[in-house]
């Protein structure tokens, strides 16, 4: 039987399957952070259970921590409790933890790949919805709830129903200035935020293959935003080059054996997908969301849609509600929308290539007077170190931006970095839901270059026509 990549990964990890029952999968890698793990460890203690595979579980601190201080004693409230609990739980169980004093610390979906913890062919879970990021390596990776975190800690397995398979093919080459973020936003705009529900998506096509691993991670990161269980990209030479010599990647003969196996991780020719979506890369413009979900997105050269022209009553009602919240009128030109804040960071766009793209735009320029704050938050200590080695921090600071320590930051209103009421933000994060970046905050999702351009011009501009330094 010819199989898709997803089917190969799923079937190779089944440890038990009985008629009429949901299969049980073996989990190769479990990543944890301070927000969704405390109750899971409490559950283990109450039941008198141990962590089954300590060497397959790794922790970091990212969601609730401050990006301004590195001292846990200077944290307050829930953030301090969560960080101390994770530290205590990891020490008690022997789990490796990249804490706030480690330069390996970072956003869990940035830290995992750069350490080589993410490898092709693995099953990877984390108590975080954007675990799909790791699918960029040809791994079956998905987010789980806290009760499932406890189950994986105790058994290194998880009950998991089979999903449908979806292929999204992006044919041809993108135009100059078009990034992975634009590609995935365009995909979600076409499929809608529910288009992938019940599916695991495999991204393919020339435009996907041309992406770096960092770009591929951006694409898979947002698979969940189209309702998919996970996103996948088959591994290739780009994948292997990225992973070679990473701290936790195989070494020597083990590396050679691993690569031989990884080369088999691809969809068989003639395998059938349940759903197929095709996009032409040349049609993708820089993307900007106009509403309150990632599927409400258009090209920078378009105008805000008019709900009155929408035929579907549900879509129409959603658009009307979104425009009322976001404070925009139908037919508004995106290039007429000014912003109050800019956020460059998150597990979607905080890697070194993202920061380089933003710095290229901001070099020699200053943030616009109407922009109150520009936050640039690297995804890990290693990204921060590399950026500073290249002088990117100096470019951002000279432009009037704030250069911060690693963390999830303003992606979500769970820490000190958030929007004021009704402030509008150009953000490189992955969700533009109501209140996501702070109470009544208004979020527009864009690429790092587009966010940087909004910072220096004070409004959205078409990056394709900018003179870059």
Swiss-Prot record:
Reaction catalysis annotation: (2R,3S)-3-isopropylmalate = (2S)-2-isopropylmalate
Pathway recorded for this protein: Amino-acid biosynthesis; L-leucine biosynthesis; L-leucine from 3-methyl-2-oxobutanoate: step 2/4
Gene3D superfamilies linked: Aconitase, domain 3
Recorded GO MF terms: 3-isopropylmalate dehydratase activity; 4 iron, 4 sulfur cluster binding; metal ion binding
Pfam families (alphabetical): Aconitase (PF00330)
GO biological process: L-leucine biosynthetic process
Keywords in alphabetical order: 4Fe-4S, Amino-acid biosynthesis, Branched-chain amino acid biosynthesis, Iron, Iron-sulfur, Leucine biosynthesis, Lyase, Metal-binding
SUPFAM superfamilies given in the database record: Aconitase iron-sulfur domain (SSF53732)
UniProt xrefs under InterPro entries: 3-IsopropMal_deHydase_lsu, Acnase/IPM_dHydase_lsu_aba_1/3, Acoase/IPM_deHydtase_lsu_aba, Aconitase_4Fe-4S_BS, Aconitase_4Fe-4S_dom, IPM_dehydratase_rel_enz, IPMI_cat
Enzyme Commission (EC) number: 4.2.1.33
Enzyme class: lyase
Annotated residues for binding of [4Fe-4S] cluster: 347, 408, 411
Keyword Amino-acid biosynthesis part of the UniProt annotation: yes
Free-text remark on how the cofactor is bound: Binds 1 [4Fe-4S] cluster per subunit.
Cofactor (UniProt): [4Fe-4S] cluster
PROSITE patterns: ACONITASE_1 (PS00450), ACONITASE_2 (PS01244)
Annotated function: Catalyzes the isomerization between 2-isopropylmalate and 3-isopropylmalate, via the formation of 2-isopropylmaleate.
Family: Belongs to the aconitase/IPM isomerase family. LeuC type 1 subfamily.
Subunit (UniProt): Heterodimer of LeuC and LeuD.
Protein name as it appears in the record: 3-isopropylmalate dehydratase large subunit
Annotated source species: Histophilus somni (strain 2336)
Highest classification ranks of the organism: Bacteria, Pseudomonadati, Pseudomonadota, Gammaproteobacteria, Pasteurellales
Gene: leuC
């Amino acid at each position: 039987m010819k199989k898709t990549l997803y089917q190969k990964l799923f079937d190779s990890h089944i440890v038990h399957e009985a008629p009429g029952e949901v299969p049980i999968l073996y989990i190769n890698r479990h990543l944890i952070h301070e927000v969704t793990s405390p109750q899971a460890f409490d559950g283990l203690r109450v039941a008198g259970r141990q962590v089954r595979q300590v060497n397959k579980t790794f922790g970091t601190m990212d969601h609730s921590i401050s990006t301004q201080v590195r001292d846990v004693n200077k944290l307050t409230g829930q953030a301090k409790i969560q960080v101390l609990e994770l530290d205590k739980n990891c020490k008690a169980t022997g789990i490796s933890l990249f804490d706030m004093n480690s330069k390996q610390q970072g956003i869990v979906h940035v830290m995992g790949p750069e350490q080589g913890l993410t490898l092709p062919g693995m099953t990877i879970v984390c108590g975080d919805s954007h675990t799909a990021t790791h699918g960029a390596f040809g791994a079956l990776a998905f987010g789980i709830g806290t009760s499932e975190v406890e189950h994986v800690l105790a058994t290194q397995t998880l009950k998991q129903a089979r999903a449908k398979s979806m292929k999204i093919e992006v044919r041809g080459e993108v135009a100059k200035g078009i990034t992975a973020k634009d590609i995935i936003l365009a995909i979600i705009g076409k499929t809608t935020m529910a288009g992938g529900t019940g599916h695991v998506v495999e991204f393919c096509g020339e435009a996907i293959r041309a992406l770096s691993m960092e770009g591929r991670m951006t694409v898979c990161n947002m698979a969940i935003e189209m309702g998919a269980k996970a996103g996948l990209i088959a591994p290739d030479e780009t994948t292997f080059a990225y992973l070679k010599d990473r701290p936790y990647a195989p070494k020597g003969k083990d590396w050679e054996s691993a690569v031989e196996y990884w080369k088999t991780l691809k969809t068989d020719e003639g395998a059938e997908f349940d759903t197929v979506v095709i996009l032409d890369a040349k049609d993708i413009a820089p993307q900007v969301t106009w509403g309150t979900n990632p599927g409400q997105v258009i090209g920078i050269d378009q105008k805000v849609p008019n709900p009155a022209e929408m035929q579907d009553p549900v879509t129409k009602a959603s658009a009307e509600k979104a425009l009322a919240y976001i404070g925009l009128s139908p037919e508004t030109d995106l290039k007429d929308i000014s912003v109050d804040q800019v956020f460059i960071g998150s597990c979607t766009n905080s890697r070194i290539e993202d920061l380089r793209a933003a710095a290229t735009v901001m070099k020699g320029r200053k943030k616009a007077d109407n922009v109150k704050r520009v936050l640039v938050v690297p995804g890990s200590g290693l990204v921060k170190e590399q950026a500073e080695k290249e002088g990117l921090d100096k470019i951002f600071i000279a432009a009037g931006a704030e250069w911060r320590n690693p963390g999830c930051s303003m992606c979500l209103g769970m820490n000190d970095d958030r929007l004021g009421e009704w402030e509008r933000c150009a953000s490189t994060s992955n969700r533009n839901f109501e209140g996501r970046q702070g109470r009544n905050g208004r979020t527009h999702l864009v690429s790092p270059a587009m966010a940087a351009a909004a910072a220096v011009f004070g409004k959205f501009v078409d990056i394709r026509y900018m003179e870059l330094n």
